[in-house]
Protein backbone atom coordinates (compact mmCIF):
# COMPACT_ATOMS: atom_id res chain seq x y z
CA UNK A 1 0.00 0.00 0.00
CA UNK A 2 1.63 3.20 -1.09
CA UNK A 3 -0.32 5.25 1.42
CA UNK A 4 0.52 8.82 0.50
CA UNK A 5 -2.43 10.53 -1.20
CA UNK A 6 -3.47 12.32 1.94
CA UNK A 7 -0.53 14.71 2.10
CA UNK A 8 -1.66 16.65 -0.93
CA UNK A 9 -4.24 17.95 1.44
CA UNK A 10 -2.64 20.04 4.05
CA UNK A 11 0.03 21.18 6.28
CA UNK A 12 -1.40 21.48 9.79
CA UNK A 13 -0.38 23.16 12.97
CA UNK A 14 1.32 22.72 16.31
CA UNK A 15 2.06 24.02 19.77
CA UNK A 16 5.08 25.30 21.66
CA UNK A 17 3.83 24.37 25.10
CA UNK A 18 2.64 20.81 24.97
CA UNK A 19 1.99 17.92 22.59
CA UNK A 20 -1.72 18.65 22.57
CA UNK A 21 -1.60 22.41 22.57
CA UNK A 22 -4.38 23.10 25.03
CA UNK A 23 -2.71 25.90 26.96
CA UNK A 24 -1.15 25.59 30.40
CA UNK A 25 -0.42 22.08 31.62
CA UNK A 26 -1.22 20.60 35.00
CA UNK A 27 1.44 18.89 37.10
CA UNK A 28 0.35 15.55 35.63
CA UNK A 29 0.59 17.05 32.16
CA UNK A 30 4.13 18.24 32.86
CA UNK A 31 5.15 14.78 34.02
CA UNK A 32 3.64 13.15 30.94
CA UNK A 33 5.26 15.75 28.73
CA UNK A 34 8.69 14.97 30.18
CA UNK A 35 8.01 11.24 29.91
CA UNK A 36 7.21 11.52 26.22
CA UNK A 37 9.89 14.08 25.41
CA UNK A 38 13.40 13.24 24.28
CA UNK A 39 16.09 14.65 26.62
CA UNK A 40 17.58 16.66 23.75
CA UNK A 41 15.71 18.26 20.81
CA UNK A 42 15.67 15.88 17.81
CA UNK A 43 16.20 18.64 15.23
CA UNK A 44 19.15 21.00 14.93
CA UNK A 45 18.89 24.75 14.39
CA UNK A 46 19.92 24.30 10.76
CA UNK A 47 17.25 21.65 10.20
CA UNK A 48 14.57 23.96 11.60
CA UNK A 49 15.76 26.73 9.31
CA UNK A 50 15.54 24.47 6.26
CA UNK A 51 12.12 23.27 7.42
CA UNK A 52 10.86 26.86 7.18
CA UNK A 53 11.98 26.92 3.54
CA UNK A 54 10.28 23.61 2.68
CA UNK A 55 7.51 23.73 0.08
CA UNK A 56 5.24 20.78 -0.57
CA UNK A 57 5.34 19.44 -4.14
CA UNK A 58 3.25 16.66 -5.65
CA UNK A 59 2.48 15.19 -9.06
CA UNK A 60 -0.21 12.93 -10.50
CA UNK A 61 -3.57 11.83 -9.17
CA UNK A 62 -5.26 8.51 -8.54
CA UNK A 63 -8.21 6.96 -10.37
CA UNK A 64 -10.92 7.57 -7.76
CA UNK A 65 -9.72 10.92 -6.47
CA UNK A 66 -11.73 13.06 -8.94
CA UNK A 67 -14.87 11.06 -8.09
CA UNK A 68 -14.34 11.48 -4.35
CA UNK A 69 -13.65 15.22 -4.46
CA UNK A 70 -17.34 16.13 -4.36
CA UNK A 71 -17.89 14.08 -1.21
CA UNK A 72 -14.75 15.48 0.45
CA UNK A 73 -15.78 19.07 -0.36
CA UNK A 74 -19.23 18.43 1.10
CA UNK A 75 -17.74 16.84 4.22
CA UNK A 76 -15.25 19.60 4.98
CA UNK A 77 -18.10 22.09 4.67
CA UNK A 78 -19.75 20.39 7.66
CA UNK A 79 -16.66 20.85 9.86
CA UNK A 80 -16.60 23.92 12.16
CA UNK A 81 -13.85 26.39 11.26
CA UNK A 82 -12.41 26.28 14.79
CA UNK A 83 -11.41 22.60 14.49
CA UNK A 84 -7.71 22.21 13.68
CA UNK A 85 -6.65 20.02 10.72
CA UNK A 86 -4.35 17.90 12.88
CA UNK A 87 -7.23 17.22 15.26
CA UNK A 88 -9.27 15.88 12.34
CA UNK A 89 -6.40 13.59 11.35
CA UNK A 90 -5.73 12.23 14.84
CA UNK A 91 -9.43 11.51 15.43
CA UNK A 92 -9.56 9.49 12.22
CA UNK A 93 -6.37 7.63 13.09
CA UNK A 94 -7.63 6.82 16.60
CA UNK A 95 -10.85 5.35 15.22
CA UNK A 96 -8.91 3.34 12.65
CA UNK A 97 -6.56 1.94 15.30
CA UNK A 98 -9.32 1.13 17.81
CA UNK A 99 -11.42 -0.79 15.29
CA UNK A 100 -8.38 -2.79 14.15
CA UNK A 101 -7.43 -3.60 17.75
CA UNK A 102 -10.91 -5.13 18.09
CA UNK A 103 -9.99 -7.61 15.36
CA UNK A 104 -6.61 -8.26 16.99
CA UNK A 105 -8.39 -8.99 20.28
CA UNK A 106 -10.75 -11.52 18.71
CA UNK A 107 -8.23 -12.96 16.23
CA UNK A 108 -4.73 -12.87 17.82
CA UNK A 109 -3.36 -15.47 15.38
CA UNK A 110 -5.33 -14.19 12.35
CA UNK A 111 -6.92 -17.62 11.99
CA UNK A 112 -10.01 -17.10 14.15
CA UNK A 113 -13.35 -15.59 13.17
CA UNK A 114 -14.36 -12.35 14.86
CA UNK A 115 -17.98 -11.31 15.49
CA UNK A 116 -19.54 -9.91 12.32
CA UNK A 117 -19.95 -6.48 13.91
CA UNK A 118 -16.17 -6.29 14.42
CA UNK A 119 -15.57 -6.53 10.64
CA UNK A 120 -18.26 -3.92 10.03
CA UNK A 121 -16.64 -1.66 12.64
CA UNK A 122 -13.24 -2.09 10.98
CA UNK A 123 -14.67 -1.25 7.55
CA UNK A 124 -16.40 1.83 8.97
CA UNK A 125 -13.27 2.82 10.89
CA UNK A 126 -11.17 2.71 7.74
CA UNK A 127 -13.75 4.69 5.77
CA UNK A 128 -13.88 7.33 8.50
CA UNK A 129 -10.08 7.57 8.54
CA UNK A 130 -9.97 7.81 4.75
CA UNK A 131 -12.58 10.58 4.80
CA UNK A 132 -11.02 12.63 7.60
CA UNK A 133 -7.53 12.11 6.20
CA UNK A 134 -8.74 13.52 2.88
CA UNK A 135 -10.24 16.72 4.29
CA UNK A 136 -7.59 17.82 6.76
CA UNK A 137 -5.72 19.70 4.05
CA UNK A 138 -8.90 21.33 2.84
CA UNK A 139 -9.59 22.41 6.41
CA UNK A 140 -6.06 23.83 6.67
CA UNK A 141 -6.50 25.94 3.55
CA UNK A 142 -9.97 26.94 4.65
CA UNK A 143 -8.69 28.17 8.03
CA UNK A 144 -5.37 29.51 6.73
CA UNK A 145 -3.50 27.24 9.14
CA UNK A 146 -1.19 25.40 6.73
CA UNK A 147 2.39 24.77 7.89
CA UNK A 148 5.21 22.24 7.37
CA UNK A 149 4.21 20.53 10.61
CA UNK A 150 0.84 19.60 9.13
CA UNK A 151 2.52 17.76 6.25
CA UNK A 152 4.77 15.90 8.67
CA UNK A 153 1.88 15.12 11.01
CA UNK A 154 -0.17 13.79 8.11
CA UNK A 155 2.63 11.51 6.88
CA UNK A 156 3.24 10.32 10.43
CA UNK A 157 -0.39 9.32 10.92
CA UNK A 158 -0.38 7.56 7.55
CA UNK A 159 2.75 5.59 8.46
CA UNK A 160 1.04 4.24 11.59
CA UNK A 161 -2.29 3.69 9.86
CA UNK A 162 -0.59 1.61 7.17
CA UNK A 163 0.56 -0.89 9.82
CA UNK A 164 -2.92 -1.33 11.27
CA UNK A 165 -4.69 -1.39 7.91
CA UNK A 166 -2.55 -4.18 6.44
CA UNK A 167 -2.80 -6.15 9.69
CA UNK A 168 -6.58 -5.77 9.79
CA UNK A 169 -6.80 -6.94 6.19
CA UNK A 170 -4.80 -10.10 6.91
CA UNK A 171 -7.06 -10.84 9.89
CA UNK A 172 -10.21 -10.30 7.81
CA UNK A 173 -9.16 -12.94 5.27
CA UNK A 174 -7.71 -15.23 7.97
CA UNK A 175 -4.29 -15.19 6.34
CA UNK A 176 -2.71 -16.46 9.56
CA UNK A 177 -3.24 -19.97 8.18
CA UNK A 178 -0.57 -19.07 5.62
CA UNK A 179 2.09 -17.34 7.74
CA UNK A 180 4.55 -16.76 4.89
CA UNK A 181 1.90 -14.93 2.89
CA UNK A 182 0.81 -12.90 5.92
CA UNK A 183 4.41 -11.93 6.61
CA UNK A 184 4.90 -10.85 3.00
CA UNK A 185 1.69 -8.82 2.77
CA UNK A 186 2.30 -6.89 5.99
CA UNK A 187 5.91 -6.05 5.26
CA UNK A 188 5.18 -5.31 1.60
CA UNK A 189 2.67 -2.68 2.74
CA UNK A 190 5.12 -0.91 5.05
CA UNK A 191 7.93 -1.26 2.49
CA UNK A 192 5.89 0.39 -0.28
CA UNK A 193 4.91 3.25 2.02
CA UNK A 194 8.58 3.74 2.89
CA UNK A 195 9.55 3.66 -0.79
CA UNK A 196 6.95 6.33 -1.60
CA UNK A 197 8.80 8.70 0.72
CA UNK A 198 12.20 7.39 -0.33
CA UNK A 199 11.56 8.54 -3.90
CA UNK A 200 10.28 11.84 -2.50
CA UNK A 201 13.54 12.24 -0.56
CA UNK A 202 15.39 11.69 -3.83
CA UNK A 203 13.28 13.80 -6.20
CA UNK A 204 11.69 16.37 -3.89
CA UNK A 205 8.23 15.55 -5.29
CA UNK A 206 5.61 13.18 -3.89
CA UNK A 207 4.17 11.23 -6.81
CA UNK A 208 0.71 9.68 -6.89
CA UNK A 209 -0.05 6.62 -8.99
CA UNK A 210 -3.23 5.78 -10.87
CA UNK A 211 -3.86 3.11 -8.22
CA UNK A 212 -3.01 4.70 -4.91
CA UNK A 213 -4.05 4.73 -1.29
CA UNK A 214 -7.69 5.72 -1.92
CA UNK A 215 -8.22 2.77 -4.25
CA UNK A 216 -6.44 0.37 -1.90
CA UNK A 217 -8.52 1.53 1.06
CA UNK A 218 -11.79 1.03 -0.85
CA UNK A 219 -10.62 -2.45 -1.85
CA UNK A 220 -9.82 -3.29 1.78
CA UNK A 221 -13.20 -1.99 2.97
CA UNK A 222 -14.84 -4.34 0.46
CA UNK A 223 -12.79 -7.26 1.84
CA UNK A 224 -14.00 -6.51 5.38
CA UNK A 225 -17.58 -6.51 4.11
CA UNK A 226 -17.00 -9.79 2.27
CA UNK A 227 -15.83 -11.26 5.60
CA UNK A 228 -19.25 -10.27 6.97
CA UNK A 229 -21.22 -11.68 4.05
CA UNK A 230 -19.29 -14.85 3.28
CA UNK A 231 -17.38 -15.64 6.47
CA UNK A 232 -14.65 -18.31 6.61
CA UNK A 233 -16.26 -20.52 3.93
CA UNK A 234 -15.85 -17.71 1.41
CA UNK A 235 -12.13 -17.21 2.05
CA UNK A 236 -11.51 -20.96 2.18
CA UNK A 237 -13.31 -21.65 -1.09
CA UNK A 238 -11.21 -22.56 -4.11
CA UNK A 239 -10.84 -20.36 -7.18
CA UNK A 240 -11.55 -22.38 -10.35
CA UNK A 241 -8.70 -22.80 -12.83
CA UNK A 242 -6.14 -21.22 -10.45
CA UNK A 243 -6.92 -23.90 -7.85
CA UNK A 244 -6.00 -21.68 -4.91
CA UNK A 245 -7.98 -20.50 -1.90
CA UNK A 246 -9.88 -17.23 -2.24
CA UNK A 247 -7.90 -15.77 0.68
CA UNK A 248 -4.75 -15.84 -1.44
CA UNK A 249 -6.26 -13.55 -4.07
CA UNK A 250 -5.60 -10.38 -1.99
CA UNK A 251 -2.07 -11.67 -1.38
CA UNK A 252 -1.49 -12.11 -5.12
CA UNK A 253 -2.86 -8.62 -5.70
CA UNK A 254 -0.31 -7.40 -3.14
CA UNK A 255 2.47 -9.09 -5.12
CA UNK A 256 1.31 -7.43 -8.34
CA UNK A 257 0.90 -4.06 -6.63
CA UNK A 258 4.33 -4.31 -5.03
CA UNK A 259 6.03 -5.08 -8.34
CA UNK A 260 4.17 -2.30 -10.15
CA UNK A 261 4.70 0.35 -7.46
CA UNK A 262 8.33 -0.51 -6.74
CA UNK A 263 9.15 -0.41 -10.45
CA UNK A 264 7.92 3.19 -10.56
CA UNK A 265 9.55 4.12 -7.25
CA UNK A 266 12.97 2.76 -8.14
CA UNK A 267 12.88 4.35 -11.58
CA UNK A 268 12.66 7.71 -9.81
CA UNK A 269 15.17 6.71 -7.13
CA UNK A 270 17.83 5.72 -9.67
CA UNK A 271 17.25 8.51 -12.19
CA UNK A 272 15.39 11.37 -10.50
CA UNK A 273 17.88 12.69 -7.96
CA UNK A 274 17.71 16.49 -7.76
CA UNK A 275 20.87 16.91 -5.70
CA UNK A 276 24.43 17.26 -6.93
CA UNK A 277 25.40 14.48 -9.37
CA UNK A 278 21.95 12.92 -9.10
CA UNK A 279 21.98 12.63 -5.30
CA UNK A 280 19.04 13.12 -2.92
CA UNK A 281 17.51 16.46 -2.04
CA UNK A 282 19.97 16.51 0.89
CA UNK A 283 22.97 15.72 -1.32
CA UNK A 284 23.33 12.17 0.04
CA UNK A 285 23.44 8.83 -1.77
CA UNK A 286 20.10 7.81 -3.27
CA UNK A 287 20.64 4.31 -1.86
CA UNK A 288 21.32 5.37 1.73
CA UNK A 289 17.67 5.07 2.91
CA UNK A 290 17.72 1.37 1.99
CA UNK A 291 19.97 0.63 4.95
CA UNK A 292 17.18 1.48 7.38
CA UNK A 293 14.25 -0.41 5.87
CA UNK A 294 16.60 -3.19 4.77
CA UNK A 295 17.78 -3.66 8.36
CA UNK A 296 14.20 -3.84 9.65
CA UNK A 297 13.10 -6.43 7.10
CA UNK A 298 16.31 -8.49 7.46
CA UNK A 299 15.91 -8.68 11.24
CA UNK A 300 12.21 -9.51 10.87
CA UNK A 301 12.92 -12.37 8.45
CA UNK A 302 15.79 -13.79 10.52
CA UNK A 303 13.84 -13.74 13.78
CA UNK A 304 10.80 -15.24 12.05
CA UNK A 305 12.71 -18.12 10.48
CA UNK A 306 15.13 -18.79 13.37
CA UNK A 307 12.54 -18.90 16.14
CA UNK A 308 12.49 -22.26 17.90
CA UNK A 309 9.01 -21.62 19.29
CA UNK A 310 7.36 -20.42 16.05
CA UNK A 311 7.07 -16.90 17.43
CA UNK A 312 5.52 -15.35 14.33
CA UNK A 313 3.15 -18.24 13.61
CA UNK A 314 1.76 -18.18 17.16
CA UNK A 315 1.75 -14.41 17.70
CA UNK A 316 1.60 -12.80 14.23
CA UNK A 317 -0.33 -9.70 15.32
CA UNK A 318 2.10 -8.80 18.11
CA UNK A 319 5.00 -9.47 15.77
CA UNK A 320 3.64 -7.27 12.97
CA UNK A 321 2.83 -4.45 15.38
CA UNK A 322 6.32 -4.57 16.90
CA UNK A 323 8.10 -4.25 13.57
CA UNK A 324 5.37 -1.95 12.28
CA UNK A 325 6.16 0.60 14.99
CA UNK A 326 9.84 0.38 14.07
CA UNK A 327 9.03 0.90 10.39
CA UNK A 328 6.75 3.82 11.21
CA UNK A 329 9.51 5.57 13.13
CA UNK A 330 12.16 5.24 10.44
CA UNK A 331 9.61 6.36 7.85
CA UNK A 332 8.92 9.45 9.93
CA UNK A 333 12.64 10.12 10.17
CA UNK A 334 12.86 9.80 6.38
CA UNK A 335 10.07 12.37 5.99
CA UNK A 336 11.87 14.69 8.42
CA UNK A 337 15.12 14.21 6.46
CA UNK A 338 13.32 15.18 3.25
CA UNK A 339 11.58 18.23 4.71
CA UNK A 340 14.77 19.47 6.40
CA UNK A 341 17.12 18.46 3.57
CA UNK A 342 19.28 16.48 5.97
CA UNK A 343 21.05 13.13 6.16
CA UNK A 344 19.48 10.01 7.67
CA UNK A 345 21.65 8.30 10.28
CA UNK A 346 21.53 4.53 10.64
CA UNK A 347 22.05 4.39 14.40
CA UNK A 348 18.63 4.68 16.00
CA UNK A 349 16.91 3.53 19.18
CA UNK A 350 14.15 2.08 16.96
CA UNK A 351 16.34 -0.99 16.39
CA UNK A 352 16.62 -1.82 20.09
CA UNK A 353 13.36 -3.82 20.13
CA UNK A 354 14.27 -6.08 17.18
CA UNK A 355 17.83 -6.36 18.58
CA UNK A 356 16.46 -7.74 21.86
CA UNK A 357 14.62 -10.48 19.97
CA UNK A 358 17.68 -11.24 17.86
CA UNK A 359 20.03 -11.45 20.85
CA UNK A 360 17.58 -13.60 22.80
CA UNK A 361 17.56 -16.11 19.95
CA UNK A 362 21.34 -15.90 19.65
CA UNK A 363 21.64 -16.96 23.30
CA UNK A 364 19.23 -19.86 22.78
CA UNK A 365 16.15 -18.04 24.07
CA UNK A 366 17.57 -17.37 27.52
CA UNK A 367 14.29 -15.51 28.16
CA UNK A 368 10.96 -16.74 26.77
CA UNK A 369 10.65 -15.28 23.26
CA UNK A 370 7.02 -14.37 23.91
CA UNK A 371 8.03 -12.21 26.86
CA UNK A 372 10.81 -10.56 24.85
CA UNK A 373 8.32 -9.90 22.05
CA UNK A 374 6.08 -8.01 24.46
CA UNK A 375 9.07 -6.04 25.75
CA UNK A 376 10.08 -5.19 22.18
CA UNK A 377 6.50 -4.20 21.32
CA UNK A 378 6.14 -1.85 24.29
CA UNK A 379 9.58 -0.33 23.79
CA UNK A 380 9.07 0.20 20.04
CA UNK A 381 5.70 1.86 20.60
CA UNK A 382 7.06 4.11 23.35
CA UNK A 383 10.10 4.98 21.22
CA UNK A 384 7.88 5.94 18.27
CA UNK A 385 5.52 8.09 20.34
CA UNK A 386 8.40 9.79 22.15
CA UNK A 387 10.08 10.75 18.90
CA UNK A 388 6.86 12.00 17.29
CA UNK A 389 5.85 14.08 20.32
CA UNK A 390 9.33 15.60 20.57
CA UNK A 391 9.48 16.52 16.89
CA UNK A 392 5.98 18.01 16.93
CA UNK A 393 6.68 20.05 20.05
CA UNK A 394 9.99 21.36 18.74
CA UNK A 395 8.57 22.37 15.36
CA UNK A 396 5.51 23.88 17.02
CA UNK A 397 7.66 25.95 19.32
CA UNK A 398 9.83 27.10 16.43
CA UNK A 399 6.88 28.09 14.23
CA UNK A 400 4.84 29.54 17.13
CA UNK A 401 1.75 27.48 16.32
CA UNK A 402 -0.40 24.82 17.96
CA UNK A 403 -0.77 21.10 17.29
CA UNK A 404 -4.48 20.56 17.88
CA UNK A 405 -5.68 24.13 18.09
CA UNK A 406 -5.98 26.96 15.59
CA UNK A 407 -4.66 30.32 16.71
CA UNK A 408 -7.47 32.56 17.94
CA UNK A 409 -6.63 35.30 15.44
CA UNK A 410 -6.71 32.84 12.53
CA UNK A 411 -9.93 31.18 13.63
CA UNK A 412 -11.57 34.55 14.24
CA UNK A 413 -10.64 35.95 10.84
CA UNK A 414 -11.92 32.83 9.08
CA UNK A 415 -15.10 32.80 11.13
CA UNK A 416 -15.96 36.17 9.66
Curated annotation (Swiss-Prot):
Coiled coil: none annotated. Glycans are attached at residue 144. The modification Phosphothreonine is found at residue 40. It is found in: Endoplasmic reticulum membrane; Nucleus membrane. It catalyses: CDP-ethanolamine + a 1,2-diacyl-sn-glycerol = a 1,2-diacyl-sn-glycero-3-phosphoethanolamine + CMP + H(+); CDP-choline + a 1,2-diacyl-sn-glycerol = a 1,2-diacyl-sn-glycero-3-phosphocholine + CMP + H(+); 1-O-alkyl-2-acyl-sn-glycerol + CDP-choline = a 1-O-alkyl-2-acyl-sn-glycero-3-phosphocholine + CMP + H(+); a 1-O-(1Z-alkenyl)-2-acyl-sn-glycerol + CDP-choline = a 1-O-(1Z-alkenyl)-2-acyl-sn-glycero-3-phosphocholine + CMP + H(+). Pathway: Phospholipid metabolism; phosphatidylethanolamine biosynthesis; phosphatidylethanolamine from ethanolamine: step 3/3; Phospholipid metabolism; phosphatidylcholine biosynthesis; phosphatidylcholine from phosphocholine: step 2/2. GO terms for molecular function: 1-alkenyl-2-acylglycerol choline phosphotransferase activity; diacylglycerol cholinephosphotransferase activity; ethanolaminephosphotransferase activity; metal ion binding; phosphotransferase activity, for other substituted phosphate groups. Keywords: Endoplasmic reticulum, Glycoprotein, Lipid biosynthesis, Lipid metabolism, Magnesium, Manganese, Membrane, Metal-binding, Nucleus, Phospholipid biosynthesis, Phospholipid metabolism, Phosphoprotein, Transferase, Transmembrane, Transmembrane helix. The active site is at residue 155. GO terms for cellular component: endoplasmic reticulum membrane; nuclear membrane. Its EC number is 2.7.8.1, 2.7.8.2, 2.7.8.22. It is a multi-pass membrane protein. Mg(2+) 1 binds at residues 133, 154. It is an enzyme of class 2 (transferase). Pfam families: CDP-OH_P_transf (PF01066). The modification Phosphoserine is found at residue 18. Disulfide bonds: none annotated. Residues 1-20 are annotated as: Disordered. Belongs to the CDP-alcohol phosphatidyltransferase class-I family. Homodimer. Catalyzes both phosphatidylcholine and phosphatidylethanolamine biosynthesis from CDP-choline and CDP-ethanolamine, respectively. Involved in protein-dependent process of phospholipid transport to distribute phosphatidyl choline to the lumenal surface. Has a higher cholinephosphotransferase activity than ethanolaminephosphotransferase activity. This is Choline/ethanolaminephosphotransferase 1.
Amino acid sequence: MSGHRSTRKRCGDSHPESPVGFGHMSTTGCVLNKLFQLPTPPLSRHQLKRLEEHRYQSAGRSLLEPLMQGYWEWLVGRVPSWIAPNLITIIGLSINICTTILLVFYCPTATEQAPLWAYIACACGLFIYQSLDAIDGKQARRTNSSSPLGELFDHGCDSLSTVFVVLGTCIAVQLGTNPDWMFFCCFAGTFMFYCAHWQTYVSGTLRFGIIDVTEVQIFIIIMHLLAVIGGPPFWQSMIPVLNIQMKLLPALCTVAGTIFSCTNYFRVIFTGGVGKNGSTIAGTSVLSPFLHIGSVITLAVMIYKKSAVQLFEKHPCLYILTFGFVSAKITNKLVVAHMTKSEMHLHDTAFIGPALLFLDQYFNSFIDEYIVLWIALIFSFFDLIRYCVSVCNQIASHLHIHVFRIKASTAHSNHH
